[in-house]
């Protein structure tokens, strides 16, 4: 019984271990890095840290994702698995400066 409980407790960690983690920072109303290369066909965990004193919205029509990130905080967005290609994203509150692309190869 103990072993079964241990296996059940570890199962979520084993599932998450298959996700690839990428970090994206919002600083001065820009995404850093502005380009991220990821493997096609894999689920991606994107951790977005907003270092600005104002909120920003991660928005991508290509990825069908929107997420408001409050100032000085982090958010997680799961994407994929992606087909090979380019997937653009913007910071909807600062579209002129906050933009980038995820390239799946």
Residue ranges and their predicted role:
Residues 16-17, 56:
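Glycine-rich phosphate-binding "P-loop"
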Residues 12-13:
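N-terminal signal peptide c-region/cleavage motif recognized by signal peptidases
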Residues 18-23, 30, 70-105:
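Extracellular/periplasmic metallocenter environments
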Residues 35-52, 74-82, 88-90:
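Beta-strand cores of secreted/periplasmic/IMS beta-sandwich domains, seen most often
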Residues 51-71, 100:
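Histidine- and aromatic-enriched segments that form or immediately flank copper-ligand environments
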């Amino acid at each position: 019984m103990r072993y079964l409980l241990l296996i059940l407790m570890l199962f979520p960690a084993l599932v998450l271990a298959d996700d690839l983690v990428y970090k994206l920072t919002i600083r001065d109303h820009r995404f850093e890095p502005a380009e991220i290369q990821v493997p096609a066909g894999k689920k991606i965990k994107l951790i977005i840290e907003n270092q600005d004193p104002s909120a920003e919205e991660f928005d991508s029509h290509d990825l069908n994702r929107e997420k408001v990130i409050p100032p000085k905080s982090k958010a997680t967005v799961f994407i994929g698995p992606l087909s090979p290609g380019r997937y653009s994203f913007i910071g909807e509150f600062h579209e002129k400066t906050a933009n980038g692309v995820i390239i799946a190869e």
